[in-house]
Amino acid sequence: GKAEAIRRLRKGSANKVPFQPLPTTSPRKDSPLRILGVGEIRHPALIGYLRERGIDPAVAGALCREVHYAIGERRFFAIGFRNDAGGWELRNSQFKGSSTPKSITTFDRHGDTTLLFEGFFDLLSYLTLQHEPTPTADTAVLNSVMNLPRALPFLARHATIHAFLDNDEAGRLTLERL
């Protein structure tokens, strides 16, 4: 643990700490991710993860589910956010991934203004700050900036787009493409 690492650093033997790679949890071509079950978010680890991220669990519970999945023979669980094609965006403290098919998620309230988010945790953060359990305005979640072309028909129907994208190169390029 931490105390052992400090002790070894003080003794000058830190280079003798054995390297133990973390097991990979990302899907491989020979072991695709399979959804095993979906239900209400109940696991204490997932509720704790939401709280660590500053997300109101009631907000997450309105839009997300607890998804149990397998990669090969190993079983896992995560917070799942469903996309318009029936796939899931999956997050927990150890994993960020998705099931197929990969797509955007939209909430159509038939307005002339839309909100655009890069990822679903961005949407959950926004809703937590607004004290709203679900979007009241038209909303699109890209679930990846690579999905922008899929969102363009939905976005084009709106006179105003409020974009909540990451302040990085991918977010800036996405904004330029709008």
Regions found by a protein language model. Name each.
Residues G39-E40, P44, G48, G61-E73:
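Eukaryote-skewed repeat-based solenoidal scaffolds used as protein-protein interaction platforms
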Residues S144-L148, L165-L175:
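Acidic, metal-coordinating catalytic cores used for nucleic-acid/nucleotide bond scission
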Residues Y69-R157:
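Phosphate-handling DNA/RNA-contact segment within nucleic-acid enzymes
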Residues K2-L9, G54-E66:
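Short, surface-exposed acidic
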Residues L116, H158-A170:
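Acidic beta-strand-to-loop metal/phosphate-binding motif
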Residues P153-F154, R172-L178:
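Short, aromatic/basic amphipathic alpha-helical patches
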Residues G1-Y49, E169, L173:
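Non-catalytic accessory segments of DNA primases and related replication-initiation nucleases
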